[in-house]
Amino acid sequence: MAAISINVSTLKPLGDRVFVKVSESEEKTAGGILLPDSAKEKPQIGEVVAVGEGKRNDDGSRSAVDVKVGDKVLYSKYAGTDIKLSGDDYVLLSEKDILATVA
């Protein structure tokens, strides 16, 4: 299988999906202990890098997505599809899996 190159800036999610760059997980505890990868929790916060056009309604119109590119969001722990591109971690979420925006 040939590897393909995807430019994140040209990626456009479909429907009400949101593409999020995952924030880095904590490298050490509050007490200063370094955590191995196996002990790190999956981050649940990230920055929106692309947004779909919104969910299509029965009449054919679209419901706008409530978040925009650049928003920091908190999302469900087991939500979405994890994607790794150019060494960075991303998650493709449905809008309903986003719990809150972070100021």
Curated annotation (Swiss-Prot):
Classification via PROSITE patterns: CHAPERONINS_CPN10
UniProt keyword annotation of Iron present: no
Stated name of the protein: Co-chaperonin GroES
Superkingdom of the source species: Bacteria
Chain's gene name: groES
Chief location: cytoplasm
GO BP term, example: chaperone cofactor-dependent protein refolding
UniProt xrefs under PANTHER family: 10 KDA HEAT SHOCK PROTEIN, CO-CHAPERONIN GROES
GO molecular function: ATP binding; metal ion binding; protein folding chaperone; protein-folding chaperone binding; unfolded protein binding
InterPro entries with a match to the protein in the record: Chaperonin_GroES, Chaperonin_GroES_sf, Chaprnonin_Cpn10_CS, GroES-like_sf
